[in-house]
Amino acid sequence: MKELNRRTFLTLSGAAVVALSLAGCGGGPSAPPAPAAPTQKELDLLKALNRALEDHWNELGRPGTLRTLSYSQDASDFARHFVSPCVKADKAEVEMTPEQDAAFENEMLERLQALRKKYGSDMSLREGVIGCEYVLGHPHPHEMKLTIPYALSGENFKNTFIEMHNWMDMETRDLGIYCPTVAGTDYMVIVPLSDRRVH
């Protein structure tokens, strides 16, 4: 660390002294990893879903009902963690051991409860996600399966939109979207999020 005269050193804040000392030692506290930014695939899917939502309400003659859904980093992170066993194994279908399943459920239930608390209600977020055969807290074999290949049109997209719409309520303003590539195939995972906090 370069020499500082005593008067200058004493005027530094505590944080500045720590930072300066660390810089002199060649080290420093590691910053937490930044949340993953949405990919172009995910942004394109959000745009396509909003376009389908607009068409839906226009066809019903209720354009005033339309609300544009926004990308939610919280819900997207939940989706990413939810399907991580498949992504890590690079397999669309995985079978966990009972121990792995129990640990995974505990972690995801903690994440779920934290988001429900943050957004004001147990109705803010469901125990599952669209695009994955696995539901937290329900008896099942220890299996997880990605079910919806990525598409912006066609039957897969239409069915996904219908399922998303059925999950939505009047407080749904945001979507979590995660589009992993697993075993060479792109998939889509969607999490509707309802913000029920009192504003």
Which stretches of residues belong to each language-model region?
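Short, well-ordered surface patches within globular domains
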Residues: P33-L115
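A well-ordered secondary-structure block
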Residues: A102-H199
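Short N-terminal secondary-structure initiator segments
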Residues: E3-L4, A37-Q40, V198-H199
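N-terminal secretory signal peptides and thylakoid transit peptides that target proteins
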Residues: M1-L20
